Amino acid sequence: MNKEPMSMHGYNKICAELKQLKEVERPNIVKEIDIARGHGDLKENAEYHAAKEKQRFIEARIVDLSEIVANAQVIDPSALAHNKVSFGSTIKILNLDNDKEFSYTIVGSVESDPAKGLISFGSPIAKSLIGKSKGDAVSIQLPNGESDFEILDIYYKEICFDEN
């Protein structure tokens, strides 16, 4: 698997979820399964089957998060030069088709929140912008077709990761 770039915040968030799953959720579901097992015939025991399904979900999530942590590449975006679009850059772009301005910050996939302008480095928009400079024109394939954009500004600003 490829390295997964993320900020220290993203890394800590993933590690905290992984710890919660391993130390709290996994032991709790084992207890739930034991309790449900005591309720009789397992073939028709909905509580048991629901607990086993939850256990499968928890175990799969642990595997996924463990893989992300193993492949994490923690990047401090404040230490990067943002003269070209890179991880952690905030980019102001102008849609040349409709004169609308947009602002995006490129983050790791585990940190992305498009509604807040935080887009994954692996998204089509970010892939089209990475490596480009202020003033460059870029064509980006969007769900409703290709659009042309101009990069108005590239800079670094500290990202406020709101957990709400």
UniProtKB/Swiss-Prot annotation:
UniProt-listed Pfam families: GreA_GreB, GreA_GreB_N
GO molecular function, one term: DNA binding
BP GO terms, sorted: DNA-templated transcription elongation; regulation of DNA-templated transcription elongation
Keywords from the named record: DNA-binding, Transcription, Transcription regulation
HAMAP family referenced in this protein's UniProt entry, alphabetically: GreA_GreB (MF_00105)
Function: Necessary for efficient RNA polymerase transcription elongation past template-encoded arresting sites. The arresting sites in DNA have the property of trapping a certain fraction of elongating RNA polymerases that pass through, resulting in locked ternary complexes. Cleavage of the nascent transcript by cleavage factors such as GreA or GreB allows the resumption of elongation from the new 3'terminus. GreA releases sequences of 2 to 3 nucleotides.
Family: Belongs to the GreA/GreB family.
Name the UniProt record assigns to this protein: Transcription elongation factor GreA
Organism: Helicobacter pylori (strain ATCC 700392 / 26695) (Campylobacter pylori)
Lineage: Bacteria, Pseudomonadati, Campylobacterota, Epsilonproteobacteria, Campylobacterales
